[in-house]
Amino acid sequence: MDGMRRMPPNRSFEMKKVVVFTGAGVSADSGLSTFRDADGLWADYRIEDVCTPEALRDNRAQVVDFYNMRRREMLGKEPNAGHRAIAGLEECFDVDVITQNVDNLHERAGSSHVTHLHGELTKLRSSRDPELIVPIDGWEQRLDATAPDGALLRPHIVFFGEAVPMFERAAEIAGTADLMVVVGTSLAVYPAASLVRYVRPDVPIFLVDPGNPDTAMIRNPLTHIRSRAAEGMPELAERLKSEFS
């Protein structure tokens, strides 16, 4: 996202860089379905039927309908306390959010700089040119909608089996962190999970997740807060502001 970062007066050169890496657990706390859920939108669909290039080729109508449903679900949800706490870090830090989530709840909570690794529900792209990306107004993509280049539009989502074009940029951002916060992710989806390897070895990493994420790749000083995002992130945000700003 473009635009100036919000900075308190006379503190721009003191501000530490906080990189926040978020996963499905943050969205789940707003009531959004995730592909690991046993219920919700994903319960009636196999991933290979709605989230692969082959599915788009062989059953375009089902794929478009599925993402219309996801988009409509997203528009009916609100950012939770975890999203708001992450956005609130900008009061004291230079913050970049890297998310595996395809919803826009970080932006709606007020985060200024969000990198979406796996695409965005609020956008469509040309089936011919992956760089030709357009916003979608509302939740419904028409089956016959075309891009400015005349090609059929598709969801701006990184399907399973496709490259993750924003990963290199995300790795660069991770390498600039003075503090790293990892929220609501099992650290099991690659290449996204490997972002923690790009953080400088002396940088503290704070992990907020109620489960047992795979931390084998983390060699940094690690603090694990065993809470859901909406509960643990507000507490951690206050701690970071108190100890590091």
Residue ranges and their predicted role:
Residues 2-245:
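Conserved catalytic core of sirtuin-type NAD+-dependent deacylases
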